[in-house]
Amino acid sequence: MTKNILEQDYMRYPKASDMPAFQKYFRKVQSTSFFPLQFIYKVIFRLLKEIRHIEISRTTKIGEGLYIGHAYNITINPNAILGKNINIHRGVLIGQTNRGGRQGTPVIGNEVWIGINVAIVGKVTIGDGTQ
């Protein structure tokens, strides 16, 4: 994880200050290996997750250029894979199915817009550019 990913995320917002604090610390926790700093980032990240009702693991694979509109009540399974330039809005669930023909987690392509209160569950693939 490099500084470039955080910069790409910043570019998706009109002003850098518009990026949700949750997202900033999500990327910082992913990219920092210096223990004292990583510990501080993890504490802040965990606090923001609780306040915003967001369940995204620091190990979740999300490409650069992430845009979170209204960062609240979002759940993404740690095994899901999200591409570059994804838009995610409040109430989104990206989850796992544990049985049946769609057992597994979603793979979401690049430049996908995921609207309010959308649930994507199971082993499905959402193609590039889907809205």
For each feature predicted by the language model, list its residue ranges:
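Terminal amphipathic alpha-helical/low-complexity segments used for targeting or macromolecular assembly
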Residues: 1-53
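Structural signal for interior beta-strand "rungs" in well-ordered beta-sheet cores
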Residues: 50, 54-131
